[in-house]
C-alpha cells in the first residue's frame, strides 16, 4: 500500500535519509529504493509516494516515487 510523505533530510554522499509521515515514525530511505533514472537523490521537503517494508533496523521505504 502506497504512503505519501515528505523528505526530512537526505545525504547524497552517504546515499540515505529519512521521510516524515504524519502520525508515524520517520521512515529510513536508501538511494537504491528511489524509482528514477540517473542519479538517485531526494531534496529536503520534497513530497514522495512509497511503500514501507520491515528492514534490518526497522521500517524502510521501497518503490520511492517523487511527486
Curated annotation (Swiss-Prot):
Gene3D superfamilies: 6.20.370.130, Nucleic acid-binding proteins (2.40.50.140). The keyword Transcription applies. One of its GO terms (cellular component) is cytoplasm. Its main location: cytoplasm. It comes from Bacillus cereus (strain ATCC 14579 / DSM 31 / CCUG 7414 / JCM 2152 / NBRC 15305 / NCIMB 9373 / NCTC 2599 / NRRL B-3711). It is found in: Cytoplasm. One of its GO terms (biological process) is regulation of gene expression. Pfam families: CSD. GO terms for molecular function: DNA binding; nucleic acid binding. Keywords: Activator, Cytoplasm, DNA-binding, Transcription, Transcription regulation. The lineage of its organism: Bacteria, Bacillati, Bacillota, Bacilli, Bacillales. Homodimer. Can bind to ATTGG and CCAAT motifs (Y-box motifs) of single-stranded oligonucleotides. This is Major cold shock protein CspA. InterPro entries: Cold_shock_CspA, Cold_shock_domain, CSD, CSD_CS, CSP_DNA-bd, NA-bd_OB-fold.
Amino acid at each position: 500500500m502506497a504512503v505519501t510523505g515528505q523528505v526530512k533530510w537526505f545525504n547524497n554522499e552517504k546515499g540515505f535519509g529519512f521521510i516524515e509521515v504524519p502520525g508515524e515514525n520517520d521512515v529510513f530511505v536508501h538511494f537504491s529504493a528511489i524509482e528514477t533514472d540517473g542519479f538517485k537523490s531526494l531534496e529536503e521537503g520534497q513530497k514522495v509516494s512509497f511503500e514501507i517494508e520491515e528492514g534490518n533496523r526497522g521500517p524502510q521505504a521501497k518503490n520511492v516515487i517523487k511527486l
